[in-house]
Curated annotation (Swiss-Prot):
GO CC terms: host cell; host cell nucleus; virion component
Miscellaneous comment as given in the Swiss-Prot or TrEMBL entry: This is a macaque isolate.
Subunit note: Interacts with human UNG.
Protein known as: Protein Vpr
Database matches in Pfam families: VPR
Subcellular compartments: Virion; Host nucleus
Principal subcellular localization: virion
Task of the protein: Stimulates gene expression driven by the HIV-2 LTR. Prevents infected cells from undergoing mitosis and proliferating, by inducing arrest or delay in the G2 phase of the cell cycle. Cell cycle arrest creates a favorable environment for maximizing viral expression and production.
GO BP: any one term: symbiont entry into host cell
Keyword line: Activator, AIDS, Cell cycle, Host nucleus, Host-virus interaction, Phosphoprotein, Transcription, Transcription regulation, Viral penetration into host nucleus, Virion, Virus entry into host cell
Modified residues (Phosphoserine): S80
């Protein structure tokens, strides 16, 4: 019967937190090419106010930016060939979709905080 190697055996890997920061930087650079910087700043501020400077906040920001960029590219970004049908312009406004997603996240956060405050009173 074979034994499993210990977790610290094997090739060295990059520390998780460094990898998360690198991925976030790459996504941020790409998002700045496609979305309004003021909108991205508002999203970053919301995540920071909610999670502080934590890996959990960085992970949430990564998930939101990945989804926003995927939808943007899928809809036919002028800088990308992903999802683009030649001769057809996308009629969707992806900045408006991203704004709605951010607004939904903020409303959901406020509702969670409000329910916690009301439950705490009792």
């Amino acid at each position: 019967m074979e034994e499993r190697p210990l977790e610290n055996e094997g090739p060295q890997r990059e520390p998780w937190d460094e990898w998360v920061v690198e991925v976030l930087e790459e996504l941020k650079e790409e998002a700045l090419k496609h979305f309004d910087p003021r909108l991205l700043t508002a999203l970053g501020n919301h995540i920071y106010n909610r999670h502080g400077d934590t890996l959990e906040g960085a992970g949430e920001l990564i998930r939101i930016l990945q989804r926003a960029l995927f939808m943007h590219f899928r809809g036919g970004c002028n800088h990308s060939r992903i999802g683009q049908t030649w001769g057809r312009k996308s009629s969707l406004n992806y900045t408006a979709l991203l704004r709605r997603a951010i607004t939904h996240a903020i409303v959901k956060s406020v509702a969670t905080i409000a329910s916690f405050v009301f439950l705490k009173r009792d």
